[in-house]
Structures are given as structure tokens and as C-alpha cells.
Amino acid sequence: MKTNKNKLKLELPWDKYSDQPYVIKNKVLKKQIYKKVRFDSLKMLLVNILIWPLAVIAFFLPAKKRKVDTKQFFGLGVNLGKTNLAKMQSMVDDLGCQHLIIRIPLHDIENLDKYVHFIASFSDKDLLINILQDRRHVENHILLQKSLSKIFDACEQYTQNFQIGHAVNRKKWAFFSMDEYLAFYRVAYDLKYKHYPNLKLMGSAVIDFEYYFTIRTLFNFYPLKFDRFNTLLYVDRRGAPENKQMGLDLRGKIKLLHAILRLSAKSSTDIVITETNWPITETFPYAPTSEKECVNVDEYAKYLLRYYMLAYSSQLVSQVYWHQLIAPGYGLVDNRDGLSKYPAYSVFKCMLKLLSGCKFVDFKVDSNNLYKVSFENTQYDIIVCWCLQKVTIDTLGKQVLSKEGNNISATKIVLSDDPIYLISDKA
């Protein structure tokens, strides 16, 4: 067990508005950090040179799809201190969401009891605990082992699922290299196999479409393995989830990640998206990005449903957790002046009500960018559809619902980027 004697003198202050550390702006400090991890960066470069050609080949090979359970697929983040606990519980129940991710920040480990109380209040749900790193625990593995043991001991009665680390490729989040993260994760991994064999540990928690970091966490000589593999797959900087980056839309990015996982012995191919959203315009300082990336609340609601449908239709992702229930700058509910539900709240609720328990049937997209994701259950067939261009479709014999679940009475409808549900009873 090691402690780091070559510590940099730094603080990574917390932004209480956007629920993340502030960006490191000190240029001298940045230079010191890059110098400190230059050898780790070289290793990452060499690994990527070796793996990327194989990943591209694997991308074009057939992949075994999962039978993704819609009852398990839809998840949501809830954080301590956002509002009265009873009100938060009421909203979670109103949404019908059974799968929650809850943060425990190591920078506040001295107050672990209040997080455990919060977790216990949702003990009737399927819980995933997200352990957020801080610099002192990255540098002091003896302290890390003690803190993780406290968390595992306190939470094991409520869940066996733990995400180890968060946004590991952002230096403001306290990891300066992937080697630092891997050494950090190994402490948790060793604890699991010595004392907590029933736990399921999740990593590597890379944020955004930056798979060169992902590759380093999957191809290394550290004695560890991820029971499930998570990613914080934001696409907000590209706008809509269908927009492409390096030739890949959201489904393509998921397929590439799965291809990389198939090459590695360090993880299962069980992919979980543990965080995604869009920042909301005119909510500074609560939005986690600049105003340039922000969208209005109507776009946010459209993107939420389309993101879930694209991710689910890949049949390569077992769960997606939306970040998060209450957050003025990026959540489903604004708590700046009481509790005000954004339009996306109703969209999330309707999505769970209609689709939870359904089976996946098909995904189609045509040359007009008309998207159709088809589901079925014992009572009805349902199609979620939208079009990036405007096109008129025939809805005769089908019930038409808006993304919020409101009835639309029409035999023909002009379909746009605003998704609708087409529902027909089984014969």
C-alpha cells in the first residue's frame, strides 16, 4: 500500500452550483501536472497505437447483442441535499424509476453517516453507489483503503453495486493519469476479493467520447478486472444525439466501445452509461458547461427520449442513468425557487410508464432520417418515432401520444424531431 511522497501543492475546490470541481486554470500547475505524468502519457500513447487498428477491425465484425431488459434499463441520479427527502422520494415514486445512482464523495467521507442515511431511504430501489475520488485519496492508498472499507461496510446491506471513480480523464476530478486511476481502482479490487466477494465493481468511468483513455484502462498489466464497464457518454457538445463525431452517432459510439471491450480481458462487455444529460440555457452558474453547449428545455426533453431510444436500440447497453433528478442547470427539476419540473420530467415519466416491461422488436432509420424504435408487450405494439426532417405519416388505426403522453387526434401527422408514440392493440 503506497502513499505519494511527490505531492503537488494544489486544491481542487468544489463548485456547489454544477456539482463538480472547478476547472484548473493555473497554467503553472497544469505544466507541473503534465510533467509529473509524462511517462504515463507515453504508455497511453503506445497502447493506443497498438489497439486502435484492432478496435477498428472489431467494429466492423458482427457483435453479439444483449437481450436488454426494459425493466432494468432506465435509471436516474439522485443526490443528497437537493430538497426535502420526502419530496425527493415522492418524485422518484411518481416517475416510477426503480434504478438509482447515488454519489458518495470521498472529500466528504467524514460525513459518511448522512450519505448512508440518504441511501437507506431508497432501500426499496436497485441502487448503484458512485464513489467520487479526491486528491488526498488518490495520493494516499492507506487512507483510500480505510475509506472504502467504511463505505462498503456501511452500504453493503443496501446494494452490492459500486462505481469506483468518476470522470477519470478530467484532471479537475483529481486523477492526473490513467495509471493513477488504475492504481486507485486496484485498492478497491483487492478489498473486494479479500473481504467483500459479493460486491460488483464498475469502472472505468471515462467521460465523453474519449476512448483513448478508455483503451488505457482496458489494456494494462494491473491485476484487476471490471465486473461491469461504465462510461459517462455525453454527446451534448455535438448537439443532438444523432449528430456525428468522427463519423459516429450515439449508436456508433456505443458499438465502438463494445468492440474495444471485446478485445480486452479486463472487463465484461456489460456496458452501463452512468451519466448523461444536456446543459440547460440561461441557468448560469448551475449549467456545467458554457452557454454555447446549452439547449432550451424543449430541446432537452426531445434529446432525452431520443438518447434513450438510440442507446436502447443498440442492444449493447444494459442501463442508462440520467444525471440527475434535481439540478437547475441540467436536471429534470429546478430547485432554485421551490421545485419546478422541467418538461423533461413528464417525458421521463411517460417513457418509463409505456416502455418498462416491453420487449425490443426493431430499429429502423431511412434516408429521410426517419427513426423508428419498435417495442411490444402482451397487450400492444408501440413505436417511438421521430424525423430530423419533416415528413407526413399515416396514423390510421393507431393511438398517437406526444412524448409527454398526451393524446394527439389525427389520422395524418407531420412528424418532426419531436418524438411521438404510435400504439396499436394486438389482434
Language model segments and positions:
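C-terminal beta-strand-rich structural cap/linker in extracellular carbohydrate-active enzymes
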Residues: N48, N407-A427
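Catalytic domains of carbohydrate-active enzymes, especially glycoside hydrolases
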Residues: F74-I109, D126-L128, Q157
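Distinct, well-ordered alpha-helical segments
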Residues: L85-Q89, L112-Y115, N140-F152, D208-L224
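Carbohydrate-binding surface patches
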Residues: K364-K398
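Aromatic/acidic polysaccharide-binding cleft in carbohydrate-active enzymes
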Residues: E275-K349, K364-S367
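Noncatalytic carbohydrate-binding groove/subsite architecture in carbohydrate-active enzymes
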Residues: M178-Y307
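Substrate-binding cleft of extracellular glycoside hydrolase catalytic domains
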Residues: S123-A183, I273
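Hydrophobic faces of well-ordered beta-strands that scaffold small-molecule active sites
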Residues: Q72-V78, L100-I102, L127-I131, Q160-I164, ...
